[in-house]
Every structure is written in structure tokens, then in C-alpha cells.
């Protein structure tokens, strides 16, 4: 039989958002009351996610395109596909991207939405070396992401 592993989770709540992440992940918060970035790194590998909130409410199209421009500069042979979805109760724009780096396939999920209070930008990345762990890590962060009304 396969190995069963229970993963304890923690909840990040601040800067107008909430999400659940594995307790053994590394988390760093940077920014001020206007703009903040939460960096969550998976403990077992290369997977990471950045969640940025911005009270100046920049256009999600521009945020996604800026991220894509940066990725295209670094990885001109990348493959991308639109990935718009309903996220945290909002229509989110985004892209799913694959590129080769250091002889590995890397995948990046970019999502962004704007509410009356803030713009929320999410970028998660993982490598094929991590198998399903990296993808599952990013998917669980995205699925648990919520915007809070009171901040």
C-alpha cells in the first residue's frame, strides 16, 4: 500500500486575504499597508507562490501582462495558455505557462482579480521534479484563497 502522510496546515490572514498552507512551508511577508507580498515556499522542493495585494487597485490585465513580459524575457520559448477562472468569488484573469530551465519543465500559474477594495495577484511555480507535490501545493493555495471584507 502507498504511504499516507498527514500534513498539518496553517492559515495566513492579513492584508485583506486569507489562505491555507502546509505548516512546514516557509512564509515571508513584505510590504506596507498599501501593497504587500506574501511569499510561500514548499518545504519539500522548488514550488513557491507569491500573493500580492494592492490597495491602489491596478488593472488585472496589466498585472498579468507585466508578469508575462518578464517571463518571456527570461524564457523566450515558453508555452502559455489563457487560464481565466472564478477565484475567491471573483472573475480572475490569468495564464498557465510552461518553460524549460536547468533541464527541467517548470510550470507557472498566474491569476489576478480586482475587487472594490484591492487587486489580488497570485503567481505559483513548480518543477516537474516535484511530481504532483508541487502542483498540489499551488492548487491548494489557490483553492483556499479568500478576500476578506473587513480589511
Model-derived regions, located:
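N-terminal targeting sequences that direct proteins away from the cytosol to non-cytosolic compartments
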Residues: 1-109, 113-151
Amino acid at each position: 500500500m502507498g504511504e499516507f502522510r498527514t500534513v498539518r496546515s496553517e492559515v495566513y490572514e492579513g492584508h485583506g486575504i486569507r489562505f491555507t498552507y502546509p505548516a512546514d512551508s516557509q512564509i515571508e511577508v513584505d510590504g506596507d499597508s498599501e501593497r504587500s507580498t506574501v511569499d510561500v515556499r514548499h518545504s519539500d522542493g522548488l514550488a513557491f507562490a507569491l500573493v500580492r495585494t494592492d490597495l491602489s487597485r491596478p488593472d488585472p490585465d496589466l498585472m498579468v501582462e507585466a508578469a508575462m513580459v518578464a517571463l518571456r524575457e527570461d524564457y523566450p520559448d515558453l508555452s502559455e495558455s489563457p487560464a481565466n477562472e472564478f477565484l475567491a468569488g471573483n472573475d480572475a484573469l490569468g495564464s498557465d505557462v510552461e518553460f524549460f530551465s536547468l533541464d527541467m519543465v517548470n510550470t507557472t500559474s498566474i491569476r489576478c482579480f480586482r475587487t472594490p477594495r484591492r487587486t489580488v495577484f497570485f503567481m505559483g511555480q513548480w518543477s516537474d521534479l516535484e511530481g504532483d507535490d508541487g502542483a498540489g501545493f499551488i492548487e491548494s493555495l489557490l483553492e483556499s484563497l479568500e478576500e476578506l471584507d473587513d480589511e
